[in-house]
């Protein structure tokens, strides 16, 4: 088995049973293509989401190092920060979050509702900054201040997206391959590509487990030119950790994130409404709505390699719907 080295890494259990992989009959009829969805939005902790897969590895490493505090960063409405804070609460750890307002809004819902509301429920210590211009350096500086207060901090990068955290999505690729075996031959997999860990982990895992399937990353914050090196660097770092080769081409579509990260667009919001009305499944305005807009347009523009079944990776994020209301 090519991914046997995964078992070498300490890992906590936050997810339990494999998340559902479901066929979407009404959505498939609407698009004229077989569409399946991987439901990481229903992971049974803190309203779910993809970062919990990464945090299984990262939090295990934090405990191994004797940390009593998790430190991370993101937007005010960061799903990653919300999930990190929940993990800290579950493990009896302190959590410090460095937050920015990337869209410069003064809207009350954005500043206080959705994920930001949940941070208060998890008793998160909030530190605001003007912008996360150099988040790794800013997190290290924050960790130094927290350590000076007597804590033992463990820094988790934005999105949990380092080689260790991204192992969670190599593990997810294993889960997907097992669920598809003998049931469906997936031609294409679509995922939102942001901090790059989810995309890169899937790239490594699927290359070895489902090599005939293409993986499309729909960018949510950057052009292909800016996003590609992030994904490739993580892909290679993961492969090194697992003592594997990773040579699969990284495919990115950057036509769907405008006008920028965290700013909803019409195509993304139409995708949110469509899946809600046809399947009762909630996407979000920042990540999955834009990624689904890419899937929908990709079918109409014949951008996929063939007309076979497509798997959409639902990474979660529904709490943001409340934060972006009434603009949703």
Curated annotation (Swiss-Prot):
Subunit annotation: Homodimer.
Protein name: D-cysteine desulfhydrase
Lineage: Bacteria, Pseudomonadati, Pseudomonadota, Gammaproteobacteria, Enterobacterales
Cofactor needs: pyridoxal 5'-phosphate
Protein's organism: Escherichia coli O7:K1 (strain IAI39 / ExPEC)
Residue(s) carrying N6-(pyridoxal phosphate)lysine: 51
Keyword Lyase annotated: yes
Catalytic activity: D-cysteine + H2O = hydrogen sulfide + pyruvate + NH4(+) + H(+)
The family this protein is said to belong to: Belongs to the ACC deaminase/D-cysteine desulfhydrase family.
Pfam families: PALP
EC identifiers of the protein: 4.4.1.15
């Amino acid at each position: 088995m090519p991914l046997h080295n995964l078992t070498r890494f300490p890992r906590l259990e936050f997810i339990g049973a494999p998340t559902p992989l479901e066929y979407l009959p009404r959505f498939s009829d609407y698009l004229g293509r077989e569409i399946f969805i991987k439901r990481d939005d229903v992971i049974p902790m803190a309203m779910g989401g993809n970062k919990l897969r990464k945090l299984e590895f990262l939090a295990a490493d934090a405990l191994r190092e004797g940390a009593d505090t998790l430190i991370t960063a993101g937007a005010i409405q960061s799903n990653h920060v919300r999930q990190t804070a929940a993990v800290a609460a579950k493990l009896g750890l302190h959590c410090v979050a460095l937050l920015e307002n990337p869209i410069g809004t003064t809207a009350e819902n954005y500043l206080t509702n959705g994920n930001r509301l949940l941070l208060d429920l998890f008793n998160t210590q909030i530190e605001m900054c003007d912008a996360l211009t150099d988040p790794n350096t800013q997190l290290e500086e924050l960790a130094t201040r927290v350590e000076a207060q007597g804590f033992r901090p463990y820094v988790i990068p934005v999105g949990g997206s380092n080689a260790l955290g991204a192992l969670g999505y190599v593990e997810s690729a294993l889960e997907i391959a097992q669920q598809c075996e003998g049931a469906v031959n997936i031609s294409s997999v679509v995922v939102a590509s942001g901090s790059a860990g989810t995309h890169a982990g899937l790239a490594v895992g699927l290359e070895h487990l489902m090599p005939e399937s293409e993986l499309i990353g729909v960018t949510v914050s950057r052009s292909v030119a800016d996003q590609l090196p992030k994904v490739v660097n993580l892909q290679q770092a993961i492969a090194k950790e697992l003592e594997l080769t990773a040579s699969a081409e990284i495919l990115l579509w950057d036509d769907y994130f405008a006008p920028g990260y965290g700013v909803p667009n019409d195509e993304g919001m139409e995708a949110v409404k469509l899946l809600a009305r046809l399947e009762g499944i909630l996407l979000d305005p920042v990540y999955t709505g834009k990624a689904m807009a890419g899937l929908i347009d990709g079918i109409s523009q014949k951008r996929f390699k063939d007309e076979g079944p497509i798997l959409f990776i639902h990474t979660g994020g529904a709490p943001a719907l409340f934060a972006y209301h009434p603009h949703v």
